Amino acid sequence: MQRLKKLAGVLAMVFVVSFLFSGCADASIAERRQDTSSTLYTGYVGTSFPTSFMPWLSRDGIAPTVASMIYNTLFSYDTDSGTYAPLTAKSWCYVDLEGQPLTQDQTFQTANDNEAVENYYSTRKEDYMAVRIELYDNVYWSDGEKLTVEDVYYSFDLATDYALSNHAGALAWTADLKHESDGRKLVTQGMFTAKHPDLSGTYGILPGEEDTVMYFLVNKSFGAVTTLFNTILILPEHIWEPIVSSECQLNSKNPQGELLKRYENPVGSGAWILEKDETNTQVITLVQNPNYHLKAQDGSALYKVDKIKILLYLDSNTAIFALRKGYIDILDSAVSSNYLNLLSGEKDIFVSNAPGNGISCLVFNVNPSKPYDSGMKMLLQDIEVRKAIALAVHQEELIANVLDGAGKTASAGLISANDELLYEPQADILSGPVEERLIEANAILDERFPDKDESGYRLYNGERIHFQIVTAAANQDLVSYLQRQLQKIGIEVTLQAAGSTPETTYLYNSNFDMTVQSVILSMANADVMYKAHFVTTERSSNYGKIQNEELTDEINAMRKTLNQEARIAKIHHLQVLTAQQYYKIPLYSSNVLSVARTDRFTGYVVSDGQTVFNNETLKNLVQVTGE
């Protein structure tokens, strides 16, 4: 109780001192209290808001959230059913090389028959499969132009054309698409529409389908469609095609003229439209798109608020105090577990304690590249050293003290035990009594580094073995407890502040010893993320640049198999292989804690891995009327 009183006092003091320096200093802090409209006041904690909204520009901060509200992908992924849910496109299916559907009833409108797909394509010498998609016929851009398959073709073609896009990430998104352009010149055609036809006539577009039907050729992998379907935001061709060139690339750090105008005035097909006149560096305002094609079951608007105002706060304390005082309705930022007990008992406060879908890992730099291939980090190339450090990590202690219990332990295979289909118990090699693990860890290190200094830390060439963990300052508690745990095996670690661009500054170029990374592996993303985490070494999630032939071969085999049972079996085996590398060491799977007020809106939905500011919440909100 004393701790809660102190925390509440700190919040009050911080709010009084810092509100004038927050992102909302020039806005009326009482606006929300007096507003009776269907406007959702949303707080966000960050250092700044973007001033431009090119959808592929950034994955940092609020930018991807706003982009995904203004623009749409082809589909969204439904984790409950394990299927792609309609969004811009209403249906898809695999077809054979004559264009005939490989579905359960041999029509274009039913689910894929995976056995038929396997039987057909396993016998073909071609290195690709064909996919048919069909768009909704009533999708419009926010400027009134109709969205057609030509917009999809343009977006994906641009993503393969680095000379025009200047976007390395887009090349990764389209890596499984058998299509390529270079400087607006077609190199390989792997997409077909009415205006970009298949000259062989195999993938023909029938009369009436010109705007809605197209075909892709993709690598022989069930995961090949993943990033095409739910990662690439579709761009309006009529907006970007006249502007983008090799001299005026889509992804620009210094946009000028017409390009800057388009960055600042996005034209999207999503459920929300940017209200430019009410948007600045401190507030982002989105209004509901009245012509959005997806509706609720009763025919009403899919989302239940008319406007969303996102307000910037520079720190969590100020944002939480603003929520408690009624200046905002909801936070689109996870809050520390320190606030859980404080907020749970407050009137008109809804606390979302959602299970996380990511596993926080301690990642080792196992294969540093020049010029950073020196120093203590080179010791991490020894798999036994990595194993010793992994054995010393005490997840239960971290969960109890860093997360205040709001989390769960994770397997070294990096897939949750709750995933009944994929979880492999034999990969859980870092569980068991911590005392026994410490004995084993010290035995390993005693053989390699028997000498210690006066503080009990191990020595290498006369110097204390010390590693820096590149991570956000918010992880100070985590690093402090890791210091205590690794001290028990004579290893010293300290925090190195990650800054605002850790990937560019440290991680991509090997300028680090260890880092903290969230890993999410699932049936939906296995093809993409196993490769990103454990194979690709350039600008990928494989920060430590691990290269293991057996692991790489098994990942490639998993990606290429068209038999679902064999694919699942290989994912089980991959968990064992990745665990045995002692490369990404599980720390915990933390819950996502977030908060909202219930005096203006109710109907908040707790969604795994997300804050309470999520799509399902926006679909279910009910405005409170009366006193």
Q: Model-derived features: where do they sit?
A:
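Ligand-site clamp/hinge motif
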Residues: 258-263, 292-342, 492-494, 499
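Surface-exposed binding/hinge segments that line
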Residues: 169-249
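Gly/Pro-rich hinge or "lid" segments in bacterial periplasmic/extracellular proteins
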Residues: 78-80, 230-302, 307, 438-439, ...
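Detector for C-terminal structural segments
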Residues: 283, 360, 390-427, 474-483, ...
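Structural transition elements
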Residues: 272, 408-453, 471-476
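Aromatic- and charge-enriched surface segment that lines or borders ligand/interaction sites
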Residues: 92-173, 378-381, 386-388
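N-terminal lobe/hinge region of extracytoplasmic solute-binding protein
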Residues: 43-123, 267
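Extracellular/periplasmic solute-recognition and catalytic clefts
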Residues: 43-46, 165-169, 275-287, 311-372, ...
